[in-house]
């Protein structure tokens, strides 16, 4: 669900700035991957000295979560280039789940990562229907209440035929822009199945349906951290987050596993 309301929360955080200042000045980290305000725009930035921290923001500009980026995905690239250095990174609840999952897949070394957590406001938690809208440790914000999965429940209430028709209708809107894959912090395969001609032929719009989205849903098993960036990136407004929430519910029911809620590795990592 995309938030529509006006949101007037300040985007600066003294607590966050103080924490990152301590980490940089003490030499605990080489840099801090967070969000930077620049002439009214907010984007990812690697802060390497204290003087830059006047531009450090939490990302809530006009509404909660309106300036979110897959920081963990950027962190993987930074860590590959500087494997001996330790970096801090700004995390919300979903980002922290992503880090924990990436550790189990050996994409990041936990000894070289210092997460700095902020809690999501209740408005954002409600819109995301998030089960854990905060990291384990927060330097800013109040821990919001976990939310019911109302959207998934409403679709579950439909008949099999109506559910099938709903998803087929949604999938036909796809223009195969790969936005969902490219923004996903948990897509890190060296060779992408949904980009392979052997499985899904390129150059066809709309893509072969429903194989494209069902293949991606299978690959989200044991990986999806429910960050919702796929929803935000989709120009066709396909409710991809709802699809992956349902997949996550099935895996939780059958295997008692949700990515990032523990240090446990996915029981389905063979996929």
Please name every model-derived segment.
Residues 2-173, 181-186, 190:
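Iron-sulfur-associated redox domains of electron-transfer enzymes in respiratory
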